[in-house]
Amino acid sequence: MNKLRLVLIAALMIITAANGSRTSVAQEQPSKRLPLGAVKPALDMRSLEGSAAPTWQDLRGKVVIMDFWATWCTPCIESIPHLNGLKKELADQPVSLLSITYEPGAKVREFLKTHKMETDIFIDNDLSTFKSFSSWGIPITYVFDGEGRLVAGVSPKNLTAEIVRKILAGETPLLKEHGGWDDPAGAAKYFREQLEEDRKKFGSN
C-alpha cells in the first residue's frame, strides 16, 4: 500500500512539473495583441525629429490613437490616406494620432518622399514599444480614452471619426476587434531581422 502511494505521488509530481514547464514556456511567448483594459505600456520611443515621446500624463484628457505600421507593409500603406483623413476630420478635437514604426528614421524619411503622412510619426528602434503593446499583426491601431483606458484594438480602416467622437463622449462603441497575429513569436523574430538589415543600410537613426 505504501509503495502504491509513493508511485502515485511520484506520478503526480511529474505531471505537475510538466504542466508547470508548459505554463512557463507559454508565459515567455509574446501575446497576439494587447487586451482591452490592459495597463498602459510605457511609451519608449522618439519622434522622427529625435525628441522624446509624450508621456501618458501629457496625453491625459485626450483620446489617443496609436497606429503601428512599417514601410514594407502593404495594408499599412493602404491605410495612410484613411488615417490622414481621420487626422484632418478630428483636428478640432482633443485627439492625438501617433504612427509608430520600428524602422530607422532615415528609412522612414526616404519613404515620406513619396508618401504623405499627416499623423505624428514615432520611431521605436529597439522594438520595446512593439513588444509592450504586442503589435505584431500590423497594421493595428489601439485607442485609449481620456482616462488612459484601452477601449479598442482594431485595423485602422475600421476606425472612423464617428467612433472616436463616441469615445470622446464617454461611450464604448462595439467594434470589430483586431485578432492579433497567430504567430507573434515568429513575427517578432522577423521584425528583429528586418531591423538588423535596415540598420546596415540606413544606420540606427
Language model features by range: what are they?
Residues 1-8:
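Bacterial N-terminal signal peptides that target proteins for export
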Residues 14-23:
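C-terminal segment of classical bacterial N-terminal signal peptides
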Residues 24-56:
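N-terminal "domain-start" segment that seeds a small globular fold
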Residues 62-64, 68-72, 104, 137:
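Short pre-active-site segment immediately N-terminal to redox-active cysteine/selenocysteine motifs
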Residues 68-85:
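Conserved redox-active cysteine motifs that mediate thiol-disulfide chemistry
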Residues 93-107, 117-127:
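Thiol-based oxidoreductase modules, predominantly thioredoxin-like and allied folds used
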Residues 111-118, 124-168:
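Thiol/disulfide oxidoreductase modules built on the thioredoxin-like
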Residues 146-205:
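Thiol-/selenol-based redox modules, centered on thioredoxin-like
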